[in-house]
């Protein structure tokens, strides 16, 4: 890394444009190539390839690598981490391709087996909508549905107009609402197989830095009313096994920034 790499990384943790100032102390230890956040050492390791790292040098045995690079989404690519000494498992923070299990916390973590070495934690959209879809399908049955995501812009987009391999995403993220695709409908089926082929989806990237929204338009097998559905979702949010994933609000005054830092999906 560059000479001031550690200082810059520590500074990014210390001050965040969305979440504010880090609550605690951060100290850089250049000798150990790490920084210490509230007494917890964060080691920064540099390598040209994942298999080149020897994690055992840092006291790590049977470690879990969390891959959020976006470079690989298939088992062959992600398994390169497993070739490194000291690594036992790999978790991908995006929808996995091929036969990688997509796991949404609170929904299908029971599908994880001891022999699984590479799994996916699915996408942010999948984690947001799957708990609600499961609750609705269990109670009413879902015939068909459409998912419309209104998504905060991401680092994949451009600050100003520039080339991008995807349609429209080359246009300035802070200045435009950008129509784009989402793989959420297909990703849902990897977690809830009973909904395969029943959902469609698309997305709009909007000029906000955090908090996204998913609008579900569902055709239910069993009829209900808006009041009954809202009360059902409220009960799910308060008393079900998915209460950590689903939060409920019926306030007509809330806006997106009110949900910054929410621990719900």
Stretches found by the model and what they are:
Residues 1-55, 144, 149-265:
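C-terminal substrate-binding/catalytic lobe of Rossmann-fold NAD(P)-dependent oxidoreductases
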Residues 46-49, 69-70, 95, 123:
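Short glycine-/small-residue-rich Rossmann-like dinucleotide-binding loops
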Residues 57-59:
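A short, aliphatic-rich alpha-helical micro-motif
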Residues 61-63, 88:
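Conserved acidic residues
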Residues 69-117:
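Rossmann-fold NAD(P)-binding glycine/threonine-rich loop
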Residues 79, 134, 186-189:
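Active-site phosphate/pyrophosphate- and oxyanion-stabilizing loops and adjacent acidic/basic residues
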Residues 82-84, 135-138, 232-237:
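Short, solvent-exposed amphipathic alpha-helical segments in soluble enzyme
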Residues 96-171:
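Rossmann-like dinucleotide-binding core of oxidoreductases
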